[in-house]
Amino acid sequence: MPIKKGSLVRAVRDKLDNSLEALANDTRWPSYLFETDGEVLDMRGDYALIKFGAVPTPPVWLRQDQLAESGAAAESTS
């Protein structure tokens, strides 16, 4: 199912490592990107604005192919 605004997602480490975004940033990714659910706030082209609510951090833009719907969200739509 395609990711859309309001979806709960997690970052996929394999897709984020060695990406263009990894080359432009510190690649010591915070664990909350992969271990907690983030909500899609906005979509623009291939990118989604994600707010991870478990920690007080600003939202981040990630490519949609670097995201996977979280288990809880995917199960509730099945």
Swiss-Prot record:
Compartments in which it is found: Cell inner membrane
InterPro entries, sorted: NdhO
MF-aspect GO terms: oxidoreductase activity, acting on NAD(P)H, quinone or similar compound as acceptor; quinone binding
Main location: membrane
Bilayer topology term: Peripheral membrane protein
EC number: 7.1.1.-
Domain of life from the UniProt record: Bacteria
Residue stretches spanning the membrane: none
Top-level class of the enzyme under EC nomenclature: translocase
Pfam families with a match to the protein in the record: NdhO (PF11910)
Any one GO cellular component localisation term in the record: plasma membrane
Keyword field: Cell inner membrane, Cell membrane, Membrane, NAD, NADP, Plastoquinone, Quinone, Translocase, Transport
Catalytic activity: a plastoquinone + NADH + (n+1) H(+)(in) = a plastoquinol + NAD(+) + n H(+)(out); a plastoquinone + NADPH + (n+1) H(+)(in) = a plastoquinol + NADP(+) + n H(+)(out)
Subunit details: NDH-1 can be composed of about 15 different subunits; different subcomplexes with different compositions have been identified which probably have different functions.
Role summary: NDH-1 shuttles electrons from an unknown electron donor, via FMN and iron-sulfur (Fe-S) centers, to quinones in the respiratory and/or the photosynthetic chain. The immediate electron acceptor for the enzyme in this species is believed to be plastoquinone. Couples the redox reaction to proton translocation, and thus conserves the redox energy in a proton gradient. Cyanobacterial NDH-1 also plays a role in inorganic carbon-concentration.
Record-stated family: Belongs to the complex I NdhO subunit family.
Listed name of the protein: NAD(P)H-quinone oxidoreductase subunit O
Native source species: Gloeobacter violaceus (strain ATCC 29082 / PCC 7421)
Gene for this chain: ndhO
